Amino acid sequence: MNLDIVILAAGKGTRMKSLKPKVMQEFVGQPFLQRVINTAKELDPNKIIPIIGYKADEIKNYFSNQQLDFVIQREQLGTGHAVMQAINEITSQLTLILYGDVPLINHKLLIRLIDASKKTGIGLVTFDKTNPTGFGRIVRDDNKQKIIKIVEEKDCDHEQKKITEINTGIMCVQSDHLKKWLAQLDNNNAQKEYYLTDIIEFANKDKVEVVGIKADTETSIQGINSMEELILLERMYMQEKAEQLINQGVKIIDPNRIDIRGTLTCEENVTIDVGCIFEGDVSIKKNSKVGPYNIIKASQIGENTNLNAFNHIDDALIGDNCNIGPYARIRPATTLKNNINIGNFVEIKKSSIDDHSKINHLSYVGDTKIGKEVNIGAGTITCNYDGANKHQTIIEDNVFIESDTQLIAPVVIKKGATIGAGSTITEDAPENKLTLSRVEQKNIDNWIRPKKK
């Protein structure tokens, strides 16, 4: 698209009371600015131009692997002054101006704005707000059609303060017009700043129609200035996501107690209990249940699978008809196939487990390949690390490992083997045999138990 996108992101964010720049505060797991940039990329612009100031080096370092054209605003003298700093970077036909503290701006709204601006020359996003205090007002002509100017709150007269249509600050302007009008800005106002909104009056003087595109939801255009506003907007966002899932047939026990910090996709008859957190891309197939206080990151959950309470699942694939937890930890690069039982206080890392196998209690399984119909007893540990390198354990089909067993990798437990309780296995165990490594038991006669002195 013949479009440059300017993102205003220079402010300190004093009201956040934080050491971070405002645009680097996290909204649902990502910095504000990253979310705005993600939306900007969906529009396929020629350039994305963030205008930064406070802790500019910190921001540039964070985004160093992304194709962005940063511009520095050394003094914060208003929105108009900020865009002036980008004049030499703007080379496309249209310029879209966004704000780095509006994390939920969506590309569908922006496409409407861009399309309208192509036809008229300038467009801006507005919103009808019940309580418009603190926002610039959209002033229209006597027929309530044509936008003639925007008046900032501190410059409003008594009648203008009654207007409920507000300016969101988001606008799209044909670049030739923008450069001409920026050159005409002055700071003759209560704040002694260069207001970008003053270009609306210049547009009218040049008989360029100003079109207003109304946002459908307040969350999509809401800026964040304080930690309280951040928390409230996050909660509104979570509730919207929960309502969408409920409307798709997902049973969420309490929509006020769910955190969706990424993308959650659910099929039919999924139930999600209270206190669950979902991060990254998570999918849950039909008839599965997620118990209370599960944390699930970037994972796929199969059909008819039950996640009991208090599990932590990260970057894992869990198949159909599985039963997990409570208190299980499934770490990255783990694949559980179908009909698998993982019980309480079991940790699994970088392992694959085949159908109908179970690890019911208190075990660590790392860098391990487990076959079908394997039963691993309580207290089993795969010792995969020698202090320098990781090694693999292979447990073939139909193996039974009794309790309190250590498997010293690299090692193979072959098909049908049984490992006796309390063993430390350092060599491969043969097929269909009982393998033991216990110290011989001793019984001492005439033993006198020590007494306290």
Where does each model-flagged region fall?
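Conserved alpha/beta core of the MobA/IspD/sugar-nucleotide pyrophosphorylase nucleotidyltransferase superfamily
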Residues: 164-267
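Short glycine-enriched, charge-decorated loop/helix-capping segments at active-site entrances
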Residues: 20-26, 72, 185-188
